[in-house]
Amino acid sequence: MDDDYEAYHSLFLSLLGLCPSKTSIDENAAVFDPELVIAHCFKQFKQKDFRLPQTRRRIIMVPRKEDQTPINPASQPQAPPEPIPSFKALEAKDIQEQPEDRKTWLSRRAKLRQELESFGDVKRWLENKPSITPSEAKVLHMIHEEQSAQTNASQATTRTTRKKGPRLSRQMVPQLQLPKPPALSVMYSYLHSRKIKILEIFHKVGQGENQRITREEFITAVKAVGVPLKNQEVEDIVIYLSSLGKHNTITMDILANTYKQWSMAQQRSSLATARKRYILVKHRDSLKGPLKKQEVDAAPQLPKVDLLTVPAVDTQMEARPMTLEEMEEVGKRYRERQRQHKLMIPSIQYTEQCRLVRCGNRHFDEHCLPSTIHGDMRELIDSTRRHNFLVYLQCWKLCESYGLPLTEDILMKALLYPGDKIIFQMDKVRPIRQPGGYYSDWKVFSPNLALLRSQGPSKSKRTDKKPPKKSKKMHFKEFEEFTRKLKVRRSSSLQQTHPNSFWPGHLLDKLQLYLPTVATDRSLALFSCVQHQPHVYPATYHPDHWWPLRNKNYMTRAYYDAAKVYYIN
């Protein structure tokens, strides 16, 4: 040990260059060999083997049973071999020397499993364990399934033994099946005709299907409904229904089943009768066929003529034949023309009288008048008027329900259309005026001049016959007052209607229904009155002699002709 230590120490110092080594002193020695140092450094690693560890094999020796007898009883008992420890890995020689058969290994494993299972109560141990693994849970589940299967098998065996026992001792007594009484079908047909359900008449009984109904309750319920049955017939029904139950009692389930059977029988009988009627009708038609053929054959036949016949002349007009719908339309037009020739009123009034059924309210009647516009717009306008009328009725109901102080007249003015007013002039119907327009063509003239024009030249001649009036002298002030009055008269005489007053719904921007659940929305107004308001900053606030003096971030206005003061920085 000391020699090795000295050699190692000298070698280490020689590497560091602190002292000369023995190898360097030796003249015969070669140059420094690094292999020795590397071998010395990796000496401890070479001792270990970098291979996977060998698999360990556990062998459990089971003791022999006592009842087994030795094969050679005369031979001397040998000492039992020493048990091999369970965690000792066998060498290759031992494995080769002791070959083991597969059957013996399986028998040993089965024996070991039995011993482990009989070691203790596995179910109790697993149930008392605080946390179990998935494999343990699987074993516990298998134990529970085995126990449940054993209990079911034991119950089945007991039932079979119970059922088989009485059969050997006594014979089964045959049960009598009572015939269905005809009164039952009478009762069900009566209830079906009155649209009464059999389960509804027993209102005092509970709703369960297996609820029992006593004899007294059944009889009182049938009498309360008024079924035309005698007491004996009701008793027959009770006896029959009670015989269907287990304990000679009537249940709701029995009533439902019997009623269902009766309804199915009724359907089958109705189908059978309908089939019989169809067969009879078909048989009658088949019998009538040959009789008709015999009558036709019995009719006298006309003698055949060999002469040529004259072709029939086509008296119809050379035109396309009309269909039934076209012929009906032509007839309608013809009748309408004949009616128009006989009438003495205009066509608009006639259509109004024909198409309308008046309700008595003038506003409703004028709103529901058919439009006088021709074309596709007519149908569109009529549909919008009907829709607006329904909206008016809904608004009126809502106002009444919410107690809003909106009268019916206000809603009529706001929602209903005033109607196309028919205007006559010289026994002629004038066209409808446009918004802001006038009914007549005399727009600028006063009413007196218009009357003179309408009266014609005869009345104007009468005015010429009158003597001319004398001219009256007037002062300047009187003349000024007279002209002022004429201006007022002329302005008042002219028709000054607001351009928005014609349209329906021109008050919708002012009239709003206040409902607690509906928010007001001005965008829903169909028509709105546009009024031009004055500008926010009119020119009167800034006269011409006030101008901006500086052009910076702000602008100030000042009087430019005022005295100016200049400062020199």
UniProtKB/Swiss-Prot annotation:
Listed A to Z, the keywords are: Calcium, Metal-binding
Q: Please provide, alphabetically and separated by semicolons, the GO molecular function terms listed in this UniProt record.
A: calcium ion binding
Which residues lie within the region annotated Disordered?
Answer: 63-85, 147-172
Annotated binding of Ca(2+), by residue: 210, 212, 217
InterPro entries linked to this entry: EF-hand-dom_pair, EF_hand_dom, EFC12
| Keyword Calcium among UniProt keywords | yes
Q: Where is the composition biased (Polar residues)?
A: 148-159
Q: Where is the EF-hand domain?
A: 193-228
For this entry, the protein name equals: EF-hand calcium-binding domain-containing protein 12
Q: Which organism is it from?
A: Macaca fascicularis
